């Protein structure tokens, strides 16, 4: 079986999901072509030409609409050189419906992996008609999707054992508390209300919305306009004594889009896989799978929880080990194995 994997446009966060699926499929012996849609979109969006006969007057070669068209044409080019059985589109927000419709019309089975449920389910719902199979990262709107499409499934977030595993950590990254994630406004407001005084804290991720005078600014471990890749993030997890999972509150306003998800997010699974202790922003699935980990509901609850657990090493290490055992089977390989089985049944 041959898969063409179309990476998402953004080069952070959901890119880790794409690489996880790619590697999981390859572990099964599947022939996977990794289509770097992100690089191509960046290239066409960034290309400039000199219109001044060497005088240095540079203009953009393409506006964004044209850049998207050219990047989408490159998907077609790769597809018809490789001719896959399955096209796995991760996220797909920058892939045009025409591109998917063309591949379906020529007999390729198009799988759309939706990574933004339920926050952007309005957009994902409108897009799913162009796929043969739709995979959701949260089941809260599963029945709504199934009312519109005959082959929709919830596939849980997963981790890559080569990246997310227990370990001693790195001395330079040792901390009392670490959090890696996008600095959405809701998260900024939450963390600014947490008492971190006296704790060694590391924050990572894209925090471009953070004000210069925020008390969180000195805690960012890199430039605020940078991201932290998954390998570095896992090392931060292994090096810290505690962490926290906090879901964003931002969501689109269309049909089905909201922030009240059911499923565990990717960071919860990755933290548990690294055997890192963390406190939870509760959700039904994590309440079921990770009930051994404590929960919080407001910023004022965070510091007392951290103080108690940081003072009790044995108890903290015990629940972290139990959390790892609870997610040990949630690998990309297992998700990939399910998908191959689903596509080849009958």
Predicted feature descriptions by range:
Residues 72, 76, 299, 303, ...:
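Short, amphipathic alpha-helical "lid/cap" segments that border enzyme active or binding sites
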Residues 76-80, 100-102, 120:
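Catalytic alpha-helical scaffold of carbohydrate-active enzymes acting on polysaccharides/glycoconjugates
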Residues 88:
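N-terminal Rossmann-like NAD(P) cofactor-binding module of classical short-chain dehydrogenase/reductase
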Residues 117-132:
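Membrane-proximal helix-turn-helix segments that form the acceptor-binding/catalytic region
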Residues 102-117:
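Active-site proximal beta-strand in glycosyltransferases
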Residues 1-57, 64-70, 74, 81-83, ...:
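Nucleotide-sugar donor-binding catalytic core of glycosyltransferases
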Residues 311-342:
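A charged, aromatic-enriched C-terminal amphipathic alpha-helix characteristic of glycosyltransferases
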